[in-house]
A protein has these predicted regions:
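Short, basic (Lys/Arg/His-rich) helix/loop patches that form interaction surfaces
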Residues: 126-127, 241-296, 300-304
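Short, charged phosphate-coordinating catalytic segments
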Residues: 70-74, 144-166
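Conserved tyrosine-mediated DNA breakage-rejoining catalytic core shared by Y-recombinases
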Residues: 156-201
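Catalytic-site neighborhood detector that most strongly recognizes the C-terminal catalytic loop/helix
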Residues: 296-329
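DNA breakage-rejoining catalytic core of tyrosine-based enzymes
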Residues: 94-120, 179-197, 215-220
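N-terminal core-binding DNA-recognition domain of tyrosine recombinases/integrases
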Residues: 1-98, 122-127
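Active-site/catalytic core of tyrosine-dependent DNA strand-transfer enzymes
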Residues: 197-256, 272-273
Length: 340
């Protein structure tokens, strides 16, 4: 909308346009930029300013619109029209939605530093003393960070689901090999997700030197096993929760962290990847890329089945390249992240 052109024609903003503009005042600058670029955001990804800040913005907009309209409009009723719009804006109260009360869903830098440094094998603050358990739990956190998979998908991973630097997610409902009382199931679509070389090497070490030395682990295909009680049996959902509970108790900065929070953080990373990798393309094209990459990486059903059919390989390649580039950029400069 060109305000100058509209006002010169004695056309003020409609009530709907005014309300949309004022609603926009409630978002942070970063959120506004993402919306203007055409990036699709999940509800929890919206970040909101304080009510006072929103009110200050609205006041400034009200004064500017009144000034500009009186300056450019030619209508004899411009005073009354400007007054009506100003009163409409003045009576507006910024909307504060429950999911937007400045709740940060993504992992903080402090939390990431703790996970990637203090959970390393042999670190003096590592809450687990057994080396096999240290390595297994580091893998749990690292795989969740790099892939954003669900806890059920994590617990369902087979050793052979990880080949080289690719993790494959499969749906195995009614699996005859499943012996756990609470069977973990994949709720999302099957997909392949790339991981970094460092994480792939660490998984190989765990499988060959730690899991491989446990006799009972050879009786089933699951990647993660117990190294104490029920030695060698597949790791349960409850056991994964206990890992996170121990981490939260050991490090106050990890308060509120859970497997699902890594999934939220993955969406945050995807948004950043799209912004960085496609900053020079048109907003409509960026939104289209978002609609292809995000559903695939997260295992969601695509909006268009035809698009999925014809662009599946392209989507996989683009998603993989972007994800690996982002992960490698993150690990660069963090010395000994995957030290063994």
């Amino acid at each position: 909308i060109c305000l100058e052109t509209r006002f010169k024609r004695d056309q003020h903003l409609s009530q709907g346009e005014v309300l949309q503009l004022l609603d926009f005042c409630g978002w942070t600058v970063d959120t506004q930029k993402r919306l203007m670029k055409g990036v699709k955001l999940l509800p929890n990804a919206y970040q909101q300013v304080s009510r006072d800040m929103a009110s200050q913005r609205i006041h400034a907009i009200r004064e500017y619109l009144r000034f500009l309209y009186l300056r450019l409009a030619q209508s004899k009723d411009r005073e009354n029209i400007a007054k009506y719009v100003s009163e409409t804006i003045k009576s507006y109260k910024p909307k504060i939605k429950k999911y937007n009360k400045n709740k940060i869903i993504a992992l903080s830098d402090e939390q990431i530093d703790t996970i990637t440094q203090k959970l390393l094998l042999g670190h003096p603050e590592n809450p687990w003393k057994d080396r096999s358990i240290q390595l297994r739990n580091l893998l749990i956190f690292s795989i969740l960070y790099e892939t954003g998979i669900r806890r059920g998908e994590l617990a369902s991973l087979y050793v052979n689901d990880i080949k080289s630097t690719v993790v494959s997610i499969y749906r195995r409902h009614n699996n005859p090999l499943e012996t756990r009382k609470q069977a973990p199931n994949a709720k999302t679509g099957e997909r392949t997700i790339p991981i970094t070389d460092g994480l792939a090497r660490l998984i190989d070490i765990y499988v060959m030197e730690h899991r491989g030395s446990v006799k009972a682990a050879k009786k089933h295909p699951y990647l993660f096993v117990s190294h104490r009680k029920n030695m060698g049996k597949p790791m349960t959902i409850n056991a994964i929760h206990e890992v996170f509970k121990a981490a939260r108790l050991a490090f106050p900065e990890l308060k509120g962290i859970s497997p699902h929070k890594f999934r939220h953080h993955m969406n945050y990373r995807i948004s950043n990847m799209i912004d960085e990798e496609h900053k020079d393309v048109a907003p409509s094209q960026r939104a289209e890329i978002d609609g292809q990459v995000r559903p695939y990486l997260m295992g969601w059903s695509p909006n268009s089945k035809m698009q999925e059919t014809y662009n599946k390989r392209y989507n996989q390649e683009q998603a993989g390249k972007m994800l690996v580039a982002r992960a490698n950029k993150f690990t660069k400069g963090r010395k000994n992240k995957y030290q063994y």
